[in-house]
């Protein structure tokens, strides 16, 4: 079996449910939190000060109030936007919040090493992971641009692996307690804010519903061989997700389909893909166009490789937008499905901590391919000359964005390994 080597710690799971719709992804998180009995553990790269984050925090607080013993959250220190007053109120309520890699004179390398994970685990039995951060734009609620993203709901034994990863990270030196000091008045205002958020939802005025009792495993076929991949907490210990991903790709015999919003292929992966092409394996990669991307600098990194990828024989497709693509997924040989936080770039390979959920199941792999195909319907193909099948090199892109991408090329020699 293809994953016999790559998935050494494979576990049986009951459910592997793809969450494409942003409202489903939000509702599933709400239901998991409200149904928790013993613990809620969450890891997030980004948490903004908006309705999504405040709703999540209000639900975490209420879970603690109703007696859930362990309610803990880790957020990357660089992308923590939760107000201090709210953090103080949560602390007083028994919700523990810590940050990953705060600024440290003793650890200067922490500045570029970030926790890019997005996971919420409940009772060590169920979890959601994928591309969505805690912010409105990832759940279809932003006033301007919303991301096109994907998560997966998993129920079963691999949740224990995810929970153990959380516990290891929580007790490591990489995570620090928050020191927040606010007045009683500010803390009371934060309490009122979270109360108001939940009251509006209880009145049916929100983007999600409370107390639905939804069983997200309902009518889902049982699957086997689910593995929760994660980078080691300490870089010197264990195998990185990049290594495990390369093992799975190395085992491909017919096809490799990858969807990555940021595509700056590390040299080892690029060489591996070119090797698989020579073996007759079909390789397709879906990524953002200059029009849809939210990151001009990584897009400049991709444009450097675009012609080489197409000329090598890779079927490169660029998502037209206008919304940015943010889903991180892959399907190998039409039977192995991968969904997680991992981008095809040097940062995910070497610097960030990442997670990925993998299952070998033809029906689910086809479901994921169908999801990717929906994005392909709004994508153009890149030809051997490094351009879409159009006269214009960068269709429907503003002049200002073209200029920014052109200028970004001059930074690539300095920052490419950190994209």
Label each PLM-derived region with a short phrase.
Residues 1-7:
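Sec-dependent N-terminal signal peptides
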Residues 7-117, 121-419:
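Charged, low-complexity intrinsically disordered terminal segments
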């Amino acid at each position: 079996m293809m994953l016999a080597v790559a998935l050494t710690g494979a576990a049986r799971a009951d459910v592997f449910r793809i969450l494409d719709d942003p409202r489903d992804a939000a509702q599933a998180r709400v239901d998991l939190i409200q149904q928790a009995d013993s613990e809620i553990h969450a890891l997030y790269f980004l948490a903004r000060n908006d309705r999504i984050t405040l709703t999540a925090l209000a639900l975490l607080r209420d879970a603690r109030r109703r007696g859930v013993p362990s309610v803990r959250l880790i957020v990357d220190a660089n992308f923590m936007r939760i107000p201090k007053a709210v953090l103080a109120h949560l602390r007083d309520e028994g919700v523990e919040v810590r940050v990953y890699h705060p600024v440290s004179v003793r650890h200067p390398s922490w500045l570029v090493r970030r926790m890019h994970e997005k996971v919420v685990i409940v009772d060590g039995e169920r979890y959601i992971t994928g591309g969505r951060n805690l912010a409105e734009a990832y759940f279809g609620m932003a006033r301007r641009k919303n991301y096109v993203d994907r998560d997966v709901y998993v129920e079963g034994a691999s949740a224990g692996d995810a929970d153990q990863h959380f516990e290891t990270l929580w007790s490591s030196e990489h995570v620090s307690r928050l020191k927040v000091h606010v007045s009683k008045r500010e803390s009371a205002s934060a309490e009122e804010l979270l109360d108001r958020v939940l009251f509006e939802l209880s009145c049916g005025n929100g983007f999600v519903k409370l107390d639905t009792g939804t069983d997200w495993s309902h009518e889902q076929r049982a699957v086997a061989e689910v593995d929760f991949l994660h980078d080691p907490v300490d870089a010197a210990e264990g195998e990185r997700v990049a290594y495990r991903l390369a093992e799975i790709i190395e085992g491909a015999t017919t096809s490799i389909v990858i969807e990555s919003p940021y595509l700056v292929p590390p040299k080892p992966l690029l060489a591996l893909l070119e090797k698989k092409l020579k073996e007759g394996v079909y390789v397709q990669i879906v990524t953002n166009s200059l029009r849809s991307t939210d990151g001009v600098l990584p897009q400049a990194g991709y444009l450097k490789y675009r012609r080489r990828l197409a000329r090598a024989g890779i079927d490169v497709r660029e998502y037209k937008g206008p919304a940015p693509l943010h889903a991180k997924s892959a399907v190998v040989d039409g039977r192995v499905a991968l969904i997680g936080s991992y981008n095809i770039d040097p940062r995910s390979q070497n610097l960030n901590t990442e997670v990925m959920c993998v299952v070998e199941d033809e029906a689910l792999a086809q479901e994921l391919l169908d999801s990717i195909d929906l994005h392909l319907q709004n994508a153009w193909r890149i030809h051997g000359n490094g351009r879409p099948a159009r006269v214009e090199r960068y269709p429907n892109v503003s002049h200002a964005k073209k200029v920014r991408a052109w200028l970004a090329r001059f930074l690539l020699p300095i920052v490419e390994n950190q994209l």
